[in-house]
Amino acid sequence: PLGGARPHDVVLGVSIGPYADTPADLRVDDYKTLVDHFATLADYLAVNVSSPNTSGLRDLQGAPLRGLLAAILEERDRTGTGVPLVVKLSPDIDDLAAVVNAAEASGVDGIIFGNTTIRHQEGRGGLSGAPLGSSALRGLEQIRGRTGLPIIACGGILTPEDAAARIDAGATLVQLYTGLVYAGPGLVRKTARALQRRPPAIR
């Protein structure tokens, strides 16, 4: 159980999002309920507004974003935990600058970029892995040029070299998903060690 003992040197992030059948005007309540449930258990919470698998969810990255995040942050503050709250954005956003500005203005603690892309010809659903790499990297560079918030980069990171490229582009941290399928869980340690051996970046 999450409430039980777990290694203290492992960072636990929990991604939160609404149920697929929750009406759009009530989705904020789902987020707030999940904040209440996980605030004392997680090291950080990720507000997922970018999953392509929930109809209409990505619409929250538009005009509603700032108000949504403000409401979720208010609920976080009510818990008294101070757990960091980050927002996970899609790589398919057209006006990325406006979305980043809204996220920063809301008071979130960081940004995860990006989720899977639906701009592909491979049928329905989100596409991840290597095909996402170049667009995710370009978006990361744009975000870093707009904000000083911590950025967790994901999308198309399959090797230590991919991770290093994200750090060089301004990422604070990286996340791995598809790479684990092809290289196994050892990719995490291999990547971490490779990054530790790199000389400090000059900015």
Residue ranges and their predicted role:
Residues 1-106, 120:
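Active-site entrance/lid segments in N-terminal catalytic domains of soluble metabolic enzymes
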Residues 51-62, 98-145, 149, 183, ...:
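Glycine/Thr-rich beta-alpha phosphate-binding loop at enzyme active sites
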Residues 29-32, 93-106, 144-147, 157-174:
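Catalytic cores of alpha/beta
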Residues 1-9, 61-85, 126-151, 191-202:
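Alpha-helix-loop-beta-strand connector modules within alpha/beta enzyme cores
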Residues 13, 17, 110, 125-129, ...:
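Glycine-centered flexibility sites
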Residues 120-129, 167, 178-203:
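C-terminal helical cap(s) of enzyme catalytic domains, especially alpha/beta-barrels
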Residues 133-136, 153-165, 175, 180:
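Recognition helices and adjacent regulatory flanks at domain boundaries
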Residues 12-16, 45-48, 85-87, 111-113, ...:
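Hydrophobic faces of well-ordered beta-strands that scaffold small-molecule active sites
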